[in-house]
């Protein structure tokens, strides 16, 4: 979709899937379907070749448990099966990529608290 009054060129840069590169016309409310064959192991950049300052990040998963945190840094993931799981924490600006192993008990709730140096999140 493109709610802007100008065209954009969407260019994806996945590592494991084929990238896409297509134009999206102004005020396009339909959008363009993009699919991925395999899951990616980390987010990949999406850019606009017309407007080089525009970018976004996407993560193609093979499960429904991906989440973005709130402005306060919190998130909830529901319906995770019991067992050992790996949580991946990623942030493009602070260049954070960490993994944390967690155990989910049957019908249980697990909390994960991580703190990061706030100075890493300042705009360049």
Q: Which residues are covered by each model-predicted region?
A:
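Extracytoplasmic copper-binding redox domains, predominantly the cupredoxin/blue-copper superfamily
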Residues: 1-124
């Amino acid at each position: 979709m493109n709610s802007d009054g100008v065209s954009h060129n969407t260019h994806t840069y996945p590592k494991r899937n084929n990238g896409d590169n297509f134009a999206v016309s102004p005020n396009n409310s339909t959008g363009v379907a993009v699919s991925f064959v395999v899951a990616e192991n980390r987010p990949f950049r999406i850019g606009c070749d017309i407007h080089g300052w525009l970018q976004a990040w996407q993560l193609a998963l093979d499960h429904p448990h991906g989440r973005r945190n709130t402005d306060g840094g919190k998130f909830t993931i529901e319906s995770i099966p019991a067992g050992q799981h790996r949580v991946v924490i990623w942030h493009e600006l602070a260049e954070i990529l960490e993994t944390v192993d967690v155990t989910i008990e049957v019908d249980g709730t697990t909390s994960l608290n991580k703190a990061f140096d706030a100075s890493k999140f300042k705009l360049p």
